[in-house]
């Protein structure tokens, strides 16, 4: 939607990812955009909240692509709500991934008593394209050490490993 040079886009993405608001403001102020667009870029990464946040996003300048992204988030929320997970969903527009293969929504999973993500993932349709197999994909990674730490902090039993298993695959 915004016409931004690749170097500026990468610098802005890095500032948002590191939550460096001062640097983000400097980068945005130097962009050849309207004041309204600059304000929107500065505000979006700071937005987070529940379902009502999605409605607020429609007030921002948007393109067909951003409108589609909001619609996608609303659909994901409806599905999660239908499974009874609405109390556990919070939208944070400041979460972005460093990898260029992500193509849609990204997420992080948290547990009570743990101040950092237990898992993270998202939609990454470009990942397999990098290996010559274009295909849509969604997935996540779960931090085993973080899972064990969460179990320990919540008074759960941390099982002792009994056997090591190795799985290999090849053609």
Describe the predicted segments one by one:
Residues 1-10, 23-171:
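Positively charged, Gly/Ser-enriched RNA/tRNA-binding surfaces
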Residues 18-19:
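Short helix-adjacent coil turns
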